[in-house]
Every structure is written in structure tokens, then in C-alpha cells.
Amino acid sequence: MTIIDFMREKITSYPKISEFLINNDIHIDFTEPEPTNYGLSSNGDRLLKEDLLGVQTRKHNFVLYAIGQSINDYNRLANSNFLYELAHWLEHLQEEEFTMDVNGKDVKTTFIEATTENAMSMGLMGETINDGIMYQIQIYAIYKIESED
């Protein structure tokens, strides 16, 4: 498992995801252009700090793209509320340990927290608003990896 797998599982387990996700599948690095599809894109990983024992604290950046119905204000408000509530839920995730494969070794990893920013509409998916709107939310996952040694 990687931090990408971990966050995909967390987002899929969001209690209200079934209201907006047709087949409970979040694509990786792309999304279908039809409403209600989601894609989780990994935008980089960086080292925040490393202690003397080799324990690394890292930050992984994601963008969740969501294609939502947009026929009327009710749909657009539901989409915006979904992103708002998802952001709040993600920011309240508890620390959790999991095993991550690092260079062929199983390494103890601890998810620390998720933060979110910039939940917004990105534009039309077709020529009219009836074709759906793409929304995005940026997600940052902070996690620790124990030393590989």
C-alpha cells in the first residue's frame, strides 16, 4: 500500500460518497467526463523533516477532481456542499498506522492528518452547463515513514 492507496480508500469510505459516486470507484489520475465521476490525482510528495533515527515526516499533495450534475442551482449547491463536507470530514481523520512498500520492504507508516484547500468549480465539461461541471479540491496528507533500516 502507498499513501495514494491509503487516501483513495479513505475518500471512498466517506459516508456520503455514495450520494455522488455512481459505482464507488475513484479513478487515479483521470476522471470520466460524464457526471458523477471522480479522479484522484497525485501531485507530488516531499520530505518535511527527518529525525536522527531516519523517521521521515512527509507531505503528499493530491487533487480530487469531481464531475457533478449542474443543471440547476440545487445541483450546484449540492456539489459545493459535498466538497465542503468532504473537506471537513478529511480534516477530522484520526492518525492511523499502515504498512507501506518502500524499496521492496514493508515499512511501518503512520498517517498523521489531512488538510484541504481550494474546493471550487473549474469549468464546464461540455458546451453548456447541462453537460456537467468539473470541481476540484486539493488534499494534503501528512504521514511518517519509519526508517527502512
Where are these regions (language model features)?
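Short, low-order "capping/linker" segments at domain edges
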Residues: S41-N43
